[in-house]
Amino acid sequence: VGFKAGVREYKLTYYTPEYETKDTDILAAFRVTPQPGVPPEEAGAAVAAESSTGTWTTVWTDGLTSLDRYKGRCYHIEPVPGEADQYMSYVAYPLDLFEEGSVTNMFTSIVGNVFGFKALRALRLEDLRIPPAYIKTFQGPPHGIQVERDKLNKYGRPTLGCTIKPKLGLSAKNYGRAVYECLRGGLDFTKDDENVNSQPFMRWRDRFLFCAEAIYKAQAETGEIKGHYLNATAGTCEEMIKRAVFARELGVPIIMHDYLTGGFTANTSLAHYCRDNGLLLHIHRAMHAVIDRQKNHGIHFRVLAKALRMSGGDHIHSGTVVGKLEGERDITLGFVVLLRDDYIEKDRSRGIYFTQDWVSLPGVIPVASGGIHVWHMPALTEISGDDSVLQFGGGTLGHPWGNAPGAVANRVALEACVQARNEGRDLAREGNAIIC
């Protein structure tokens, strides 16, 4: 009796097709492309092993713990229809592998090490099922959809936004002027672009002050609550929180964070600050396409969206289906419902691999942004629904008469589309006629 050293095939330990998943397991759906000559069972088991308790060889200390309790298990494999040498590999992870309330730890475990594994030609994480027992360890969005509507006193329609352009180079005063013109023209929000932080041409404190002035002036003249997504993203968490504190002192309703470049730890810290201090939190997904664009490698955005809902954010950019940035309608709507709804049934046609119960975690408002303009309004109103932000940057500031007329055009088009929808008219068929 004793320790038997040596290398074992992963599938002998980690491929368990007889395993019945538990309600407390985190479930993952991986698209696996094995190297030539590697059986799919071995590839799937390798993913389960390397993202949980395994390493490349048997180790003496395996005998000091219970692998049956802690190991990840590849419990099902199926070929991907229409794709040669690609397989969906389903892995179950025991909940005890993960720190409570930490998206950072969850991702470090599940995707931190396996993507460079030499037995795999490519690997993509398509979806995660997060069990209620784990969700209950997260605060989630600072406020959620209903609380945001109540704070802003805006009901029965999507809200309208605009990213200030040019994104870089404006002085703080000219930037604030553009914010005022857009809000005065009828928009609900304006927005810092994702790479506007605190550069030599416009330091963050100056921008915050001039934008706050624009917000209060526009509110006084319109009688509506307005906001500007003040980007608090910074080089350190301490600096980020300092900017959030200043925004709160100015009395503005909403700030912003780039959650992928800033990181999940920073984002969760900021979300907690926002809930404690009554600030809404807008999330930009800068860098997402580096991670999710390839069809056979990386992480699908629906996983990043779920992670954001856990980490915390009241808005997140979600694609448009129309416009300049890539998005497929059914797939985009799939992760939109994962952001907004409380209980989502499995639906492979929309890319939803698992039934997800959010157990009343607040919802996130999807933001449609990127190359959209006033003629897209009927489609956006129909596709996105009321609980959304429709964000027109060039589609507002590019109006031939200027910023304020561009904002007026967007607001009038939205009001017309909402009224037509409420009257029972078909936006898909009559869209252009409605806003002419």
Swiss-Prot record:
Enzyme class, UniProt record, top EC level: lyase
Pfam families referenced in this protein's UniProt entry, alphabetically: RuBisCO_large (PF00016), RuBisCO_large_N (PF02788)
Binding annotation for substrate: N113, T163, K167, R285, H317, S369
Record-listed Mg(2+) binding positions: K191, D193, E194
GO cellular component, one term: chloroplast
Requisite cofactors: Mg(2+)
Protein modification: The disulfide bond which can form in the large chain dimeric partners within the hexadecamer appears to be associated with oxidative stress and protein turnover.
Family: Belongs to the RuBisCO large chain family. Type I subfamily.
Function: RuBisCO catalyzes two reactions: the carboxylation of D-ribulose 1,5-bisphosphate, the primary event in carbon dioxide fixation, as well as the oxidative fragmentation of the pentose substrate in the photorespiration process. Both reactions occur simultaneously and in competition at the same active site.
Miscellaneous section: The basic functional RuBisCO is composed of a large chain homodimer in a 'head-to-tail' conformation. In form I RuBisCO this homodimer is arranged in a barrel-like tetramer with the small subunits forming a tetrameric 'cap' on each end of the 'barrel'.
Protein name per UniProt: Ribulose bisphosphate carboxylase large chain
Source organism of this protein record: Byblis liniflora
Gene giving rise to this polypeptide: rbcL
